Amino acid sequence: MYYIKKTIEVAACHRLELSYPSKCTNLHGHNWIITIYCKTRKLNADGMVCDFTHVKEMIHGKLDHANLNEVLPFNPTAENIARWIVDQISSCYRADVQESENNIASYEED
């Protein structure tokens, strides 16, 4: 099995829709650090799991300097964003979404 890991930084804002009172329901921003993990049994014709630049473009191009509530079709929690990233990239099996030094959400396919 071949593996790659790509880390990107995204500056974006969001507000959460929650069932309880929270400051996170107000519009606020993060300098997100997103780590994307991809794997494959067989390298592509170029000898890669996938191109690091393409991985970055697929996520960074859509999320950077965006209001996540306007570009994503779900409540933009870190957990939901991690799942969305895995769904966007065919060879991706895990994503870590870090909204601050102490708050990180991960999604990994079984």
Spans of features found by a protein language model:
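Charge-rich, low-complexity N-terminal segments
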Residues: 1-110
